[in-house]
Regions:
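Hydrophobic alpha-helical transmembrane segments of integral membrane proteins
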Residues: 12-13, 88, 255
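Domain-terminus/edge residues, biased toward the C-terminal soluble/receptor-binding domains
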Residues: 195-428
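Compositionally biased amphipathic helical and low-complexity segments enriched in hydrophobic
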Residues: 13-18, 31, 125, 361, ...
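N-terminal cationic leader/targeting segments used for protein routing and processing
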Residues: 3, 8, 35-36, 321
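Sec-dependent N-terminal signal peptides of Gram-positive bacterial secreted proteins and lipoproteins
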Residues: 6-26
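Active-site-adjacent loops and short helices of periplasmic peptidoglycan-processing enzymes
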Residues: 2, 27-216
Length: 428
């Protein structure tokens, strides 16, 4: 008879635990409404991102863009999506494709064809049948902008100019260029069934960003394009050649990193260049920036845009310590809280440890963080399971996105678990 109260208590405990399961099940209608966390977004910080005044004005270029090379974010644009001829700025794509090819074929040589010899000035002055090391020709291509070297490089890498153009267009698509069409490796005005040889300022900046920030051969690209001069010979050492860098921007501003000029009758003067200072890297792309006798317009526009970036944009830390609220998991198991049928479970931000946690922001510009996280869930849930998303915006532009996941596994409460818990913890 003395044990009877304990049995009663045990039965009541078991009933309470099972009742808890029932209440957890009644949470399901709420859980269903909230399961799609994408539909339950909450703006946790809301700040004005409006920018006022001080933007570059009176640019000579018909199309221009300034981007942050780290993120690819556009900081300033003028008709940056208008398709225009690009002249010899084309050669940055020719160069990076050749450098990536050389990684697997470091001693590649090129025999000069009639097509290469026939290219108009500016040219190296090759002779049919001569042979050169492919890497030597890249200095001729980038320092002197030799058109014959561009054709020789294309033929050495792909066998023909046409096949090399296919590689150029494939690489452009890979980079994310949407309005670029390559026909020639040197940028001379051309037209085919796909259209004219052309790009946009925005696409051209993307290509330069790939060359200096993303490609496996970015360091070699900088080595070639920054060289003051370079000497080489044909493979039989019969003739010697000397190249000098004509990119005046490299001596124009502290931190000037790389660049390529261009000019044709259709394109006008063009330029794409980059600058790195105080851990900030900017890229400027200009198309149709004057015609003769206005050769200096591109340098004025480049300086104006670079100075705008340097003066107004600084890095700001993305808040790594942002507090994410716990979620409630119905019908879960916690041995330390057996009577609690709705558990509070912590959530973490899945941010790669090596990722740059800073973003380039204009003075007066603010970050906006959007938290998408459902408050109620049903067990079971596994550790690391995705339960939401944290997204950062600058105005309407998404600049970072991180999944949210739970920190621990939550097992489902069952009748059998309740019975086992009572047997284990209650003395009958």
């Amino acid at each position: 008879m003395k044990r009877r109260p304990h049995k009663v208590i045990s039965v009541l405990l078991l009933a309470a635990l099972i009742a808890g399961m029932g209440m957890a099940c009644r949470e399901r209608s709420l859980e269903i409404r909230n399961k799609r966390w994408e539909e339950n977004a909450e703006t946790v910080t809301q700040n004005s991102g409006r920018i006022f005044g001080d933007e570059p004005e009176n640019l000579y270029a018909r199309s221009a863009v300034l981007i942050d090379a780290d993120s690819g974010r556009v900081l300033f644009e003028k008709e940056a999506d208008v398709i225009r001829p690009m002249a010899s700025t084309t050669k940055i794509m020719t160069c990076i494709i050749a450098l990536e090819y050389l990684k697997e074929h470091p001693d590649q040589t090129v025999e000069v064809s009639d097509q290469a010899v026939s290219q108009p000035k500016v040219h190296l002055g090759m002779q049919r049948g001569e042979a050169f090391y492919l890497k030597d020709l890249l200095y001729s291509l980038m320092l002197e902008s030799h058109n014959d070297s561009a054709v020789a490089v294309a033929e050495g890498v792909a066998g023909s100019v046409e096949k090399f153009a296919e590689k150029m267009n494939a690489k452009a698509a890979e980079i994310g260029c949407k309005d670029t069409h390559f026909i020639t490796p040197n940028g001379l005005d051309a037209k085919d069934t796909g259209g004219v040889h052309s790009t946009t300022a925005k696409d051209l900046a993307k290509i330069m960003r790939y060359c200096i920030m993303i490609s496996t051969e970015k360091e070699t690209f900088l080595e070639v394009t920054r060289a003051k001069e370079y000497q080489f010979q044909d493979t039989e050492k019969k003739r010697s050649f000397s190249c000098h860098n004509h990119n005046a921007f490299l001596d124009m501003m502290d931190g000037a990193l790389s660049g390529k000029t261009g000019f044709t009758a259709d394109a006008g003067y063009c330029y794409v260049g980059s600058l790195r200072r105080d851990k900030r890297t900017f890229i400027v792309a200009l198309l149709a920036c004057g015609w003769p006798n206005n050769k200096g317009y591109k340098w004025k526009d480049t300086r104006k845009l670079m100075e705008y970036g340097l003066e107004h944009y600084q890095y700001r830390e993305i808040d790594k310590k942002m507090q994410i609220p716990e979620i409630k998991v119905a019908g879960g198991v916690d041995d330390k809280k057996p009577y609690q049928y709705c558990l509070n479970v912590p959530v973490k931000i899945e941010r790669p440890a090596e990722e740059n946690s800073k973003i380039l922001i204009r003075d007066g510009e603010e970050l906006r963080a959007k938290l998408e996280l459902a408050k109620y869930w049903n067990a079971p849930l596994k550790k690391g399971e995705k339960v939401g998303m944290l997204t950062y915006y600058l105005e309407s532009q998404k600049i970072a996105e991180y999944p949210l996941s739970i920190k621990k596994t939550v097992k489902k409460r069952t009748v059998w678990w309740c019975i086992c818990w009572v047997v284990k913890n209650v003395r009958l």
